[in-house]
Design a protein with these regions (language model features):
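Rossmann-fold NAD(P) dinucleotide-binding segment
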Residues: 52-117
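Hydrophobic beta-strand scaffold residues
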Residues: 28, 48, 117-118, 159, ...
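Rossmann-fold dinucleotide-binding core
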Residues: 5, 10, 98-176
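Helical "substrate-binding/catalytic lid" subdomain
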Residues: 167-267
Length: 267
């Protein structure tokens, strides 16, 4: 694996991954416009870059984790964008959950300079990022995925190669559709248990390995049992953004998603 890695977007997910790399003794060049995010990264030993361009100049592997399509566009093709540092051998790992068309635009801009981008969304929460319990949904040309794999294996428990560029995002949409439904189902079930006078800890213990369990139940129900929800593992605004991306994608395929429509107002 390359001796220096770039991370653009140092929020809940990107920041956790960058700190894990630093803990492994890997040099990390990072960029984020938010002062709070950059301060924590710098305090952890990271090298703070002044622009995405500077990150691209410093590293042959660059991971992007941003909150919006506008942010991705600014990072890649903005005034001091990553495309300016594009060159053969640069592999960009786009790990955000965004509309696929926007990732395609970013990939094309980098390809003009000879750089490669893989579409590699993440299945997991901020807490799972800290614990290296992430699943990476890697899609793109085989050589670029192979170049990224050693880095991804450091940061998660599994790297799934799911097909050509864009397949990763499609799998992520399917995954987050299920997660969004499981979140609401878990909360609804635990409220029913409490209203019924049951001990929520007992209910969690009984259901944990029953037919009713799910990975989301195992992750979320303990918060409900304890009544403690801090520190936050994600932002509601980010999750709502993901739901809207999924809904738009499903609509483009004329695919009905009645459960998504039912739970969307709850978020």
């Amino acid at each position: 694996m390359t001796s220096k890695v770039g991370v653009i977007g140092l929020g809940i997910m990107g920041g956790a991954m960058a700190r894990n790399l630093l803990a492994d003794g890997i040099e990390v060049a990072g960029y984020d416009p938010a002062p709070a995010a950059t301060a924590e990264f710098r305090d952890s030993g990271g090298t703070l870059a002044s622009s995405p361009f500077e990150v691209g100049r410093a590293a042959d592997l660059v991971l992007i984790s941003v909150a919006s399509s506008a942010a991705l566009q600014e990072v890649v093709t903005g005034g001091e964008g990553l495309d300016g540092a594009g060159r053969p051998g640069l592999v960009v790992i786009e790990a955000s959950t965004l509309p696929l068309i926007d990732k395609e635009v970013a990939r094309a801009a980098l390809a003009e300079r000879g750089a490669a981008m893989i579409d590699c969304p993440i299945s997991g929460t901020g807490a799972q990022a800290v614990a290296r319990d992430l699943v990476f949904l890697a899609s793109g040309d085989a050589d670029s995925v192979a170049a990224a794999r050693p880095l991804l294996e450091r940061l998660g428990r599994s790297v799934k190669e799911v097909g050509p560029f864009g397949a990763g995002s499609k799998v992520k949409y399917v995954a987050n559709l299920l997660v969004s439904i499981y979140n609401v189902a878990t909360a609804e079930a635990m409220v029913l248990a409490v209203r019924a006078g049951l001990d929520p800890a007992m209910v969690f213990d009984v259901l944990y390995d029953s037919a009713a369990t799910s990975r989301i139940f195992q992750l979320r129900a303990p918060f409900m049992v304890e009544g403690v929800y801090e520190p936050a593992t994600a932002k509601i605004s980010m999750f709502v953004k993901d739901l809207d991306v999924i809904g738009s994608f499903a609509n483009s395929l004329s695919c009905p998603t009645p459960l998504l429509a039912a739970i969307r107002p709850i978020y």
